[in-house]
Amino acid sequence: IVTVDCSDYPRPVCTLDYMPLCGSDNKTYSNKCNFCNAVVDSNGTITLSHFGRC
């Protein structure tokens, strides 16, 4: 199982780094920060599907 530690999130500002992750909502997030903010916003219903684009 692939996991990402989102314990330091949410953050008000994310960098523009491009290291894509694919969420369980089948959406590609540009980096860990954007993904983790979405996880927090979804109350943990979004999980990591895999690294890279969906």
From Swiss-Prot:
The record marks 16-17 as: Reactive bond 3. Residues 4-54 form the Kazal-like domain. It is found in: Secreted. It comes from the Eukaryota. Keywords: Disulfide bond, Glycoprotein, Protease inhibitor, Repeat, Secreted, Serine protease inhibitor. Glycans are attached at residue 43. GO terms for molecular function: serine-type endopeptidase inhibitor activity. Gene3D superfamilies: 3.30.60.30. Avian ovomucoid consists of three homologous, tandem Kazal family inhibitory domains. PANTHER family: OVOMUCOID-LIKE-RELATED, SERINE PEPTIDASE INHIBITOR, KAZAL TYPE 2, TANDEM DUPLICATE 1-RELATED. This is Ovomucoid. It comes from Corvus albus (Pied crow).
